[in-house]
Amino acid sequence: MNKSFLLLVFLSIVLGCGESSNSNDSNSTALETGFNPKCTTYNATITIYPSPYEGTLRRCNTSDRQFYVYLPEDYSEVGSSYPAMFSLHGYTSTALTNMSYTGFMKQADINDFVVIYPQGLVHETKGGTHWNTDEIGPGNSVNSIEFLESVLDWVGQNYNIDLNRFYSAGMSNGGFMSYHLACNITSKISAIASVTGSMSVFSYDNCNAQPTSVMQIHGSVDTVVPYDGTVSASGVGFKGIEDVMEFWSSNNICNIEPSIEALPDISANGVSGTHRIYLSLIHI
């Protein structure tokens, strides 16, 4: 059977992560809110396909939250500031796992940007690490927006980062959260990318975003986050991908009809794809 995808994406294989050479960083500046994580610097070997990648990570902890910061090899506190991005893991996953399959560390070294890998908390009633965008139901007081905005503000204050070029990319639930950030702290997010994510009904119905570039990568036969979405009788769930693209096309004042490019079956396994681009009529 021929399977059709919006975009054909090859993800790296997750194998593991090692670390050595710990040192403490203690000269960070706290936010006015009191957010001031303590960071440890260590050399990490991230095992991804086809070969391990080595780099220096900063693991930052508050009393109940954690995130990692990766600075490019040529990072400097003087001179031009660096763009930065969140890389958000999926439901039940971890920041370290996300670090392994995304390959952003290598890309950061090549293209000079900073990557932040935050760690989600366990859902209070469902279990499993997550980002709270309400797509998996009520009974959850975790404030993911507050945490991620604090991390964004803190790294902007403590590293040479251009806060006018801050982005978010996420896998599955991390994709949901990237949309949620674009809706809730819209002035701080330049663009987002979602891989197999969507928008929760709550995000969709309450989104107050300024024009923001988005990229969605999704399988049309995805059974975990179905392409057509799913909403319960109580209104909990997430929107279909066509609805999400229509929302952002309108929000960004884009052409009604996208340009469409067929993607070839380069693996000869019956899987093809379609690339759709909605161009904005304004400068974003």
Regions found by a protein language model. Give the residues of each.
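Primarily recognizes the serine-hydrolase "nucleophile elbow" in alpha/beta-hydrolase
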Residues: 157, 164-210
